[in-house]
Regions:
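Conserved short beta-strand edge segments in small beta-sheet-based binding/regulatory domains
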Residues: 83-95
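Homeobox/homeodomain signature
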Residues: 35, 81-82
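Short S/T/G/P-rich N-terminal loop/turn motif that feeds into the first structured element of a domain
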Residues: 1-57, 65-72, 95-109
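Short amphipathic alpha-helices in soluble, non-transmembrane regions
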Residues: 72-81
Length: 109
């Protein structure tokens, strides 16, 4: 069972809009190859969600990771691929716990 979750919220930067459609396709093909490599390491990609209509972020993705290190590896791979040159992003990494465990942490605040 995965122990950590990763949420990535992102929106395009002006540099993305400056690329041609062909340049965008080429860039995203490279990102896809890197994602497929990471999935072989136990990361489970839950999906990408379009959210521009409901908030300030264009979209977000969610993954389950076997550990905090694999979540960080996912973020590092995005940086290496040049993702942050074209997209502003905020990440959340958290440890998975039961509802009861989480409620206990709230009581203990």
């Amino acid at each position: 069972m995965p122990d950590y979750g990763l949420i990535e919220m992102f929106r395009p930067r002006p540099e993305w809009y400056a690329l041609s459609r062909e340049e965008r396709r080429t860039f995203l093909a490279g990102c896809r190859r890197e994602i497929e490599r990471l999935l072989g390491g136990g990361v489970r990609f839950l999906g990408v969600y379009a959210s521009r209509w409901s908030g300030e972020w264009h979209g977000y993705s969610a993954c389950e990771c076997p550990g905090a290190d694999s979540a960080q590896e996912w973020i590092d791979a995005a940086e290496k691929a040049g993702w942050f040159r074209y997209f502003e992003q905020a990440n959340l990494v958290g440890r998975k716990m039961s509802l009861e465990e989480y409620f206990h942490t709230l009581v203990e605040l």
